[in-house]
Amino acid sequence: MSGVRMRHWPGNPERPGLALHCMLASGSYWAGIAGRLDGRIDLRAFDLPGHGQSDDWSPAPDGPDYHTAVTRIAASFIDRPVDLIGHSLGGTVALRLAVAAPEAIRSLTLIEPVLFAAARDDEQRALHEQMGELIAAGHSDQAARVFMAIWGAQGYDDLPPRMQQHMRDRISLIAENSPALSDDRANILRPGGLESITAPVLIISGQDSPPVVHAIAEALAARLPDVGRASVPGARHMLPITHADQVAG
């Protein structure tokens, strides 16, 4: 697909895999996990629009929202049953794909899928409202600082200036995705949706991640027919990077 940077870590051609990354990052961070999988799957990962080496996100007035656009891009790379892996926002896209086409999923690995609608959390909703207000007021640096304090591998002020600029330029995408994540605009949680996923599902969480992460995992697991859960000791939200060995298993 034009304008989308695809990355590839060759492996078993009979086990195609697709990995979907989180916001404010790129598909390159799957390299650590791909290396530890030692070719067990043929893994691909694309940079989300506005991230990494993909084109900037430029929504059309009558076009899809960001979450829908990412879902369509991901679906375009699936032509047979796939081992689907998603982290954070990528996890919600993976879950959306699995609900829409369960027959296309060989296995589903969800690493802290941030589908906040699955576990209503007043603190998290207040955080999203605060970030929206900061962004609307033009305080992108403070919005990025608030976001990274909870979800980042390190604090905003610990990042080099180039990375801080990267965060500021893209932080508005966090607010833009709030309806998809907090209100389930894609209707992922519709009756019978999660229950239709017949592939084995593994939900991985960082032990030290925000409480809402564990509440979401519990709510999703309660409805999935074939599900396992794993908690990585000492890990937080960016565990695919900080704890690649444990995540790869």
Model-derived segments and spans:
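Conserved HGGG/HGGXW glycine-rich cap/lid loop of the alpha/beta-hydrolase fold
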Residues: 2-59
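Glycine-rich His-Gly loop
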Residues: 19-22, 88, 206
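Active-site signature of alpha/beta-hydrolase-fold catalytic machinery across serine-
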Residues: 32, 76, 96-100
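Active-site loop/oxyanion-hole signature of alpha/beta-hydrolase fold enzymes
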Residues: 35, 44-85, 89, 249
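Flexible "cap/lid" loop of the alpha/beta hydrolase fold
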Residues: 95-136, 183
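Conserved alpha/beta-hydrolase catalytic His-Asp/Glu region
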Residues: 122, 139-178
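Conserved serine/cysteine hydrolase catalytic core
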Residues: 163-223, 228-231
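Catalytic histidine-centered segment of alpha/beta-hydrolase-like enzymes
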Residues: 232-245
